Amino acid sequence: MHDHLFYTASVHRDNPGALVVQESFSFPRLYLALGVTTMRTTGSNEPYADLYLQRHIEDGRVVGPHINVTAPYLEGAGTQFAQMHELKDANEAREFVDFWANEGAGSFKAYMHVTRAELGAAIAEAHKRRVTLTGHLCSVTFREAAELGIDDLEHGFIVATDFTPDKQPDVCPPGGTQKYFLQVDAHSAPFQDLIRFLISHHVAITSTLPVFELSAPGRPAPASMTRGLDTLADFARLNYLTLRAASHSNPNNHGAEALKKEMELERAFAAAGGMLLAGPDPTGSGGVVAGFGDLREVELLVEAGFSSAEAIHIATSNGAQFLGLLDRIGTLAPGKNADLVLIHGDPSKDIAEIEKVETVFKDGVGYDSAKLIESVRGQVGIR
């Protein structure tokens, strides 16, 4: 539910005009190879490439999962990404949604600098077109977004600005949120009030723990992530290792604490009855790779306190329900799509065995996981 078709890792990624690389060749194969048979892109930098890929997969000309293509980001003024359009006002936000819905986008995503007026207009137009809108927000708080009718919030509470004192309307706090996020008590009245508010407004939360694990020093490298790195082009691996070394050597790095806190808060949200979704977010410093990251997300949900069955349910059935596709996918039942994964092991006893994927069936057709992975070795970061 947070599966991009681009790769961001570069030591130059913060430079003005930096571009992200479209991965229309390698990522669809990797997603399918590791058991992802339906995905949502959750933000596009090359929307026509994503729509083209979607058509070719459905026509059987390209190997990959079924794709819910999310439109380009609904971003306000101040973005750092050259491939993102900056909205001018609420009217343009409505026109943006209308245009991309006509082009074939199946969902929308608001981004960090969007204003409340722009977000509200976009949500209203998206719902008029019967599609969902999610957000990775900063300038708008989670509570404000819920009041406006948003369907889903990405990354969990680690990006929420609700707990940042002196937060100014429609402005992303200049000092970031981590300091205040680490102080949030899952049992406190303010947090419990927020999650009750989100649940009452039917707002889902998408967990993306793997991308935050990248910033947590001292953790052993999981097999899924190590295997993912083997698919990187040489320059992409060098970029990742350089960024990782810089992050982990930073004396002000609180990534391990932040990961643990996010796990705790997501568990509290789900325990209160909230709908938790799952995705890897293959961005950041580049260590989260398509497919491998999806498996790692399930493992991290188990580390957060969910049972293996609960974690798998979050990653499958909950996602299908959110997409409105539970009558076709998300569980195994007569009449549903023949989408299933054959694993050499028992993840219900040891969740790490979820990585031992041998064959993936999509629409009844079996794909050899190892061969798909081998077909893109050394290609991630290039195409």
Predicted stretch roles:
Residues 1-61, 80, 85, 91, ...:
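Metal-associated gating/positioning segment near the N- to mid-region
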